[in-house]
């Protein structure tokens, strides 16, 4: 389902009181820089017109017209004005939004700023409206939605506000990627990083290398838990996968550009290259035939690394990046560079000869040689190189931008060297990690809770903020087999990160955010977007006591919830024992604790049931989940 809700549905479904008294502060994510409430409201009707000043606004005006089912350039008394202005007080991508009883005015120095102002405008509309009607706005006899009168000044803290979608481990269709783009646009994201290649699939057509999609895009079908799948059997049909033709990708790029989102392509090299090597076996050190990995544990680690001593590797990569550079307008191309096992390079005659010829002292310097050579290749095609923080190993390429994922240390190192950085530390922004109590979450690994994402600060005190381009959330898809689950893993952590990357640091307030998040959940319900309510669930915190006994603490991320529990294996409600903040002991003979959350006398979280033996294991390992 496409972006936002349809205004016609709001009109049919709501009856709005026409009071002139200023109401509560509007619920907007990400939080604007400045918002001033006024009295009164603007009433949206079918005669409301959208008027533009400047040819560059034709596309955003058409987009807003389609969202609100209004007329563009008409003569109604109620008007929405879109204006390009020159105002030195307004930062890049910023906008002014003014709502009066007769006029909505969105002003910016750029069409992108106008578009971001539109997203805020849509969030000023009532949230609790049915979805899907297609009648024009405010037909005769229908109640018209009221937009509160406000003055908003807004601009982003960072220029890079992204999400990464791994389409290699599991393939998502063009239509699903466009849905993801629509969802990103609601919250003013501007970069979609597509992880287009890995050991489990090659996802972009390269016309000069047809084997990449004829062979590398497909693998044997498996279901179960990632890493435990059976390897491909001899002669087994490869029926699972897919790829984007270049025409598909042009449509995605254009679709994203219409929403002021740029696509960052990633071709992961020199490691994570099994789909490439499986298609062209001469590119690895072993030159052995391999199957595209279906999600099984690899029999050896090093089979997925390109042979850096093989000149054919660079000829193939030049073909790939010639087509990638021509296809994607983004000035950056991501080359991966992560998790390269270097053992085969250490024993490969070709790699050893390369090291001798280039006077390289070790295999880290060999990887650095590779990255620097790739930077020259991309620069010659008019592109800039970006890679994961492992590209620091052995020496960083002169102009490379570092995407720091193993914590923030790599980003700090790169920034102190004067390089640009995109912060993406796994423990704050990896959207494939558990987001709550593992007993009620689909299986994955690690832990990144909603509050972790919201409280994350992308700029360490020790670096120049100007070198931090921004950041992104990363959705690796090993444990994300379908698009609905991709939505579930993205939201609401994606809401938290949208605010981290857009709003002023000082404006962040956890309790206020969770209230606004709940309003956004209503919008998501009507838009058909799946999201997680994990922040309302109990997290159990076990502790092993002397004598072998175990106590259990309980907490929730959202404040103000009541927790009820039982040890008798029944389903607790708000008549059961209430947790008072003091860790509780397991009674003699009890083998399980069941807990649930309530607010204002009504259940709000899922019931969580965890066995005592599992809690003991967690206590011994120092884990709260998994």
Could you tell me what each predicted segment is?
Residues 58-59, 171-173, 199-205, 270-276, ...:
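Flexible loop/turn segments at secondary-structure boundaries
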Residues 384-400, 406-553:
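Flexible, acidic glycine-rich loops studded with aromatic residues
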Residues 8-18:
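Bacterial N-terminal signal peptides
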Residues 23-158, 485, 501-511, 516-527:
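Contiguous, structured surface segment used for ligand recognition
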Residues 90, 96-314, 319-332, 373, ...:
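Feature activates predominantly on carbohydrate-active enzymes
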Residues 1-8:
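Bacterial N-terminal signal peptides that target proteins for export
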Residues 4, 22, 51, 504, ...:
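Short, compositionally stereotyped local motifs that mark structural "simplifiers"
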Residues 276-282, 294-400, 405-413, 417:
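Active-site neighborhood of glycoside hydrolase catalytic domains
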């Amino acid at each position: 389902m496409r972006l936002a809700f349809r205004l016609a549905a709001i009109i049919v479904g709501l009856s709005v009181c026409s009071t002139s008294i200023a109401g509560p502060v509007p619920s907007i994510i990400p939080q604007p820089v400045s918002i001033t409430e006024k009295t009164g409201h603007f009433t949206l009707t079918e005669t409301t017109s959208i008027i533009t000043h400047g040819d560059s606004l034709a596309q955003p005006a058409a987009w807003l017209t389609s969202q609100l089912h209004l007329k563009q350039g008409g003569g109604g008394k109620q008007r929405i004005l879109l204006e390009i202005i020159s105002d030195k007080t307004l930062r890049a991508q910023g906008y002014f939004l003014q709502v009066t009883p007769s006029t909505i005015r969105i002003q910016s120095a750029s069409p992108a700023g106008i578009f971001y102002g539109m997203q805020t405008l849509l969030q000023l509309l009532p949230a609790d409206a049915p979805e899907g009607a297609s009648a024009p706005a405010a037909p005769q006899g229908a109640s018209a939605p009221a937009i509160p009168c406000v003055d908003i000044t807004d601009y982003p803290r960072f220029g890079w506000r992204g999400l990464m979608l791994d389409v290699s481990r599991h393939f998502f269709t063009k239509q699903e990627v466009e849905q993801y783009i629509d969802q990103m646009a609601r919250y003013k994201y501007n970069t979609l990083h597509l992880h287009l290649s890995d050991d489990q699939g090659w996802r972009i057509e390269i016309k000069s290398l047809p084997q990449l999609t004829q062979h590398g895009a497909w693998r044997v079908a498996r279901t179960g838990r990632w890493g435990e799948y059976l390897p491909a059997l001899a002669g087994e049909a490869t029926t699972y996968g897919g790829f984007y033709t270049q025409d598909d990708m042009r449509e995605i790029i254009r679709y994203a550009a219409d929403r002021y989102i740029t696509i960052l392509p990633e071709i992961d090299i020199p490691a994570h290259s099994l789909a490439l090597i499986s298609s062209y076996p001469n590119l690895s050190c072993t030159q052995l035939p391999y199957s595209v990995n279906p999600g099984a544990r690899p029999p050896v680690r090093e089979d997925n690394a390109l042979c850096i001593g093989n000149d054919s590797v660079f000829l193939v990569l030049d073909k790939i990046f010639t087509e990638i550079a021509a296809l994607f307008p983004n000035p950056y191309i991501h080359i991966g560079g992560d998790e390269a096992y270097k053992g085969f390079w250490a024993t490969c005659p070709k790699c050893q000869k390369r090291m001798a010829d280039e006077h390289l002292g070790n295999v880290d310097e060999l990887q650095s040689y590779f990255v620097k050579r790739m930077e020259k290749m991309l620069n010659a095609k008019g592109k800039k190189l970006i890679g994961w923080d492992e590209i620091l190993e052995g020496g960083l390429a002169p102009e490379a931008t570092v995407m720091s994922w193993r914590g923030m240390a790599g980003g700090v190192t790169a920034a102190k060297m004067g390089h640009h950085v995109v912060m993406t530390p796994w423990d704050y922004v990896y959207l494939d990690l558990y987001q709550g109590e593992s007993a009620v979450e689909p299986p994955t690994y690690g832990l990144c809770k909603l509050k972790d994402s919201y409280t994350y600060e992308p700029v360490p005190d020790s670096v120049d903020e100007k070198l931090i381009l921004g950041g992104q959330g990363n959705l690796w898809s090993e444990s994300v087999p379908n698009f609905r689950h991709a939505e579930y893993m993205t939201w609401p952590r994606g809401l938290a990160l949208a605010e981290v990357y857009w709003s002023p640091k000082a404006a962040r307030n956890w309790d206020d955010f969770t209230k606004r998040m709940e309003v956004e959940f209503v919008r998501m319900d009507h838009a058909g977007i799946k999201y997680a309510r994990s922040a309302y669930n109990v997290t159990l915190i076990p502790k092993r006591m002397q004598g072998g006994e175990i106590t259990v603490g309980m907490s929730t991320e959202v404040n103000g919830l009541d927790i009820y529990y039982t040890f008798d294996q029944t389903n607790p409600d708000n008549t059961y024992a209430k947790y008072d903040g003091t860790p509780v002991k397991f009674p003699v003979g009890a083998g399980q604790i069941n807990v649930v959350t309530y607010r204002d006398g009504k259940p709000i979280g899922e019931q969580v049931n965890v066995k005592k033996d599992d809690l003991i294991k967690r206590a011994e390992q120092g884990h709260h989940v998994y």
